[in-house]
Design a protein with these regions (language model features):
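Preference for protein termini
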Residues: 1-506
Length: 506
């Protein structure tokens, strides 16, 4: 939709004398399921307080208007080339990420709870990383099994004893948060190269244009400052005489998140570089430019540890910079996030994060973990094998929804093959219950219907403060009955409106 063709239901004050109900009006095809927390409706079918204005407006919309709205926001994504890459059996294909035109809403109080929990969690994880690459007291005290940490593929012995600037190992974090009837919980920590923030910003831009009146009327907190805040965070990690030169290190245009790398570099005014664009002389990192070499002070890397430096890590890497880690150890360049942070987002280490919060902060976790069974233990393996049909089983180092088994949606043959993998290498897997993920309103297949969602907020930790964008990448399982929200597995995204006030969580 253009600015001159807004839908008739985009009104700041829709008539609330007849608010929408599940199963009627525009929600005629909306079916509630008591197993799942519904973000829009209460159990009796009435609108939640936070959804009353938007839900009332949607209830009065005709399908043609909603289809036009959906087409407009999708066309914007196509026009701007907002893509991701899906890895298939034979090849990789670039696709436009699907966007849903109905925003998800959270109250100020709900967001405050998430915000406080994420700050607490990232503080503890940074302290944990400093400890395991330092004196290792948490390992000696048995908070986390030493063999789990030291044997993790993401643990980098090269980082031992290295003084990380301001003790900030993780400056950029994307934490996946889910909601059930029991409240909010953390599903996964993404500490290495978290992605998706460009989709968050793109969703917001599309929805502000498509529903400007409803957007203004909801008094939504803004997220547009993220690139500016990211630059400030990166710049704060070192001591500079003037403004530091920041570069975004990308694997290149064939990477699944290349759109995001280019977007963030452009928004920050940073250099977008590949490994071949950088060179190290006398322990200093320079970018090759048409006017000669230019020193780089901070590297926001979107390249995995293994490929950062062929001298220190994988010798066959063509993506990294020879000598980069030497320059980093010498303190001549900042790398964010620091190498070796992946050990703290390993899915087996995840199970111990509540204990790490208690150990390092002497606080109870604000955000709960999901119950997790470690197949590396005899009890965890036995439980997982006995209940395979009812569990989600994940590789401890996996991501993107690849390499996992969703028990209720699997065949007997798939479970048999997965059980063989578990018995062969139990240390590579964890299992969790199938979560009753909350459902939010989406426009799919020509109707307003509920779909399962999660959200990935983005947390920035600088020298003196922590900043969290008041929103996040809200991911949607667009397939009816599906629980996997990853874009690589058929998921999409939608805007998340965090309200400044109003709306009881009920």
């Amino acid at each position: 939709l253009t600015a001159s063709s807004h839908a008739s239901f985009d009104r700041a004050y829709p008539d609330e004398s007849s608010p929408g109900e599940a199963g009627s009006g525009g929600f005629a095809h909306y079916e509630l399921d008591a197993r799942f927390y519904d973000e829009t409706f209460r159990g009796d079918g009435s609108l939640r307080g936070v959804s009353r204005r938007l839900g009332t407006a949607l209830s009065k919309a005709v399908p043609e208007e909603l289809a036009q709205l959906q087409e407009g926001v999708a066309r914007r994504f196509i026009h701007e080339g907002i893509t991701f890459t899906v890895i298939g059996a034979d090849k990789a294909s670039e696709q436009i990420i699907p966007i849903d035109c109905v925003p998800r809403l959270l109250t100020a109080g709900e967001w405050d709870h998430i915000d406080r929990g994420l700050r607490q969690r990232l503080t503890a994880l940074n302290l944990f990383l400093g400890d395991i690459y330092g004196d290792g007291k948490s390992l000696r005290d048995g908070i986390v099994p030493p063999d789990l940490v030291l044997g993790c593929p993401q643990y980098r012995v090269e980082m031992r004893g290295l003084q990380v600037p301001n003790d900030i190992y993780v400056a950029v974090c994307g934490t996946d948060v889910v909601r059930t009837h029991d409240g909010f919980a953390v599903l996964e920590d993404n500490l290495r190269v978290p992605s998706g923030v460009s989709y968050m910003l793109a969703c917001r831009a599309a929805m502000k244009q498509a529903l400007p009146r409803l957007y203004r009327a909801h008094n939504v907190r803004e997220i547009a400052r993220y690139p500016e805040q990211l630059y400030a965070t990166l710049a704060s990690l070192g001591s500079w005489a003037g403004a530091p030169r920041v570069a975004v290190l990308t694997p290149g245009r064939y990477n699944s998140a290349y759109y995001e790398h280019a977007f963030l570099a452009g928004e920050m005014g940073a250099e977008l570089v590949e490994g071949r664009d950088l060179v190290v002389h006398d322990g200093i990192v320079y970018a090759r430019t048409v006017t000669g070499l230019r020193r780089i002070d901070v590297i926001y890397r979107r390249v995995d540890d293994d490929f950062l430096d062929p001298v220190t890590f994988r010798s066959d890497s063509l993506l990294g910079v020879p000598g980069l880690f030497h320059a980093y150890r010498a303190g001549n360049v900042v790398i964010a996030n620091a190498p070796g942070t992946g050990v703290a987002d390993d899915k087996a280490v995840y199970a111990y994060v509540p204990d790490l919060i208690r150990y390092f902060l002497d606080e109870e976790p604000i955000l709960a973990n999901v119950d997790t069974h470690l197949c590396r233990t005899r009890e965890g393996l036995a439980y997982t094998l006995d209940n395979l049909e009812d569990l989600v089983v994940k590789e401890v180092g996996g991501s993107g929804g690849y390499g996992m088994l969703v028990g209720p949606h699997s065949t007997a043959g798939e479970r048999k093959r997965f059980a063989a993998r578990l018995r062969s290498h139990p240390e590579n897997f964890i299992s969790q219950p199938v979560l009753d993920l909350s459902r939010a309103t989406c426009f799919v297949e020509g109707n307003l219907e509920p779909r399962h969602v999660d959200v990935r907020p983005f947390v920035l930790r600088g020298r003196s403060d922590t900043w969290i964008a008041p929103g996040g990448l809200c991911r949607v399982a667009l397939r009816r009955g599906g629980l996997v929200v990853n874009s690589s597995q058929g998921g999409g995204c939608k805007d998340l409106w965090v309200l400044r006030d109003g709306g009881a969580p009920d």
